From Swiss-Prot:
Keyword Nucleotide-binding: yes
Organism, as annotated: Rhodopseudomonas palustris (strain BisB5)
SUPFAM superfamilies in UniProt: P-loop containing nucleoside triphosphate hydrolases
Key words, A-Z: GTP-binding, Nucleotide-binding, Repeat, Ribosome biogenesis
Name of the protein: GTPase Der
Signal peptide start-end: none
Amino acid sequence: MSFTFAIIGRPNVGKSTLFNRLVGQKLALVDDTPGVTRDRREGEGRLGDLEFTIIDTAGLDEGAKGSLTARMQQQTETAIELADALMFVFDARAGLTPNDRAFADFARRANKPVVLVANKSEGKAGEIGAMESYALGLGDPVQISAEHGEGLSELYDALRALMPEPDVELEDDEEIDGLTEEDFSKRPIRVAIVGRPNAGKSTFINRLLGEDRLLTSPEAGTTRDSIAVEVNWKGRDFRIFDTAGLRRRSRIEEKLEKLSVADALRAVRFAEVVVLMMDSQNRFEEQDLRIADLIEREGRALVIAVNKWDLVERQGGQIAQLRTDADHWLPQIKGVPIVATSGMLGEGVDRMMEAIQDAYAVWNTRVPTAALNRWFEQAVAQNPPPAVAGRRLKLNYVTQTKARPPSFVVFCSRADAVPQSYLRYLVNSLRGVFELPGTPVRIMLREKANPFAHKRKRKS
């Protein structure tokens, strides 16, 4: 009989989206309205070489006896009884709610193995919410985006640990990451090209395609929708989204333009690498910096293209100056790749595609555990954390929780007392030692559990 997982959690946290992702087809209706799933649905799930039965359940919620909500809950309880293990899903962007905490207790009482799944983990809000979930006592959260297919290699590891050994072993040249995340070497890299209006985004993509596929005009705002085009460059597939220009909010007046901007922001969230295209005549303006900050908050790899370079009077050292300017204006993502381009003349196309591919590789970085531990010991020894109110802060150890972007948790004695300046020191040191330019690096703090805390409570 197939190993069975039940997906449980409160309404509208993405259970059906995860179910559809694992089953490989849209068997479950997905909508933003809580309670869309009313029955339990079963399907044959697959993740890499893992095969299992998966049950999608209604959102756990209290309801009057005999009501539709109560019957939905009964279906969920039946699914839990049938399952060998549970996937407890919560919305990391929303953070933990009282219902999440109540039904985490419910999951524990089921006396089944539980995989804690932090869905919608994109961006800083999602990562903070994921770290919150340690309080549930269900182990390490697996950070994913069911909608975008991110974090599946981490989910694979968590499911693999609970399942019996497969009858057939993987061949030596098959890698888990390739299997579980749709084979990175074959799946197109998703790239969004964003920037202020009339920066030359569509002209550049037309040059890349070798045809006038996208409408261009000197008038700002020609592109209204996010348009996706498929590009094969030197044997590697890319899916590139041309987006509407992003103006300051106060200058967005027409309803259609508001929708276009919302579409561009969605493209950023869906992308893996984002190219911020600037006009060489007006670079690093306030709106450029706002867009770059958005890209960093969403956890996407960043490449800066300074377009219309043909209009710049050529002098030595200009590219080096651009890099200096970028590090000055964007200290949160030091070392971001910068490419000078001319969409009109076709200059810089190859350099841009190489930069995108390199940024994607950095974004997917996993640091070997031994090297990470060596770095941590040296970084703390060279610059110990400051004492707070006369008490020394102790940093115990570090672990990488995920890639895409590289994210780490530092276990320490007092998480709330570690200054932001020291956290920035760790991020910059980590970025420099492991060569992680131009991609967000997340370091979260978590207090190490005190094994004597319960004894003190018992005495008091």
